[in-house]
Amino acid sequence: MTQEDIKDMMLYGERINLEYKEAFNELPKSFWETYSSFANTIGGQIVLGIKEHRTKMTMQERFEIQGVNNAAKILKTLWDTVNSDKVSRNILLDENVETIDYDGKQLIVVTIPMANYTERPIY
């Protein structure tokens, strides 16, 4: 994924299979709810490092690229947690998680696959 891909995605905002999350200093707790939701349906992407201003009307104003302060720390938390008993099953592979440079700010893109029906429910 490239910076241009992120720009294109942001033109249309969040969707049923795409969520943006603010994650400047840590992995947000809401990440796991979205992980479960995407895994149990059609899959999707979570982009960490984008803040939503809910009162803004246009997509250009509504979503702000903040980046993540310490990508390595957030990635460690993600992998440690997904491989612990906090999550019923890890369905992520290394290639499902990437760090993107966006105008000097780091974003983390997590592509969550749809869980096989024998693996569900993911919680």
Locate each region found by the language model.
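Conserved N-terminal catalytic/coupling substructures associated with nucleotide/phosphate chemistry
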Residues: M1-Y123
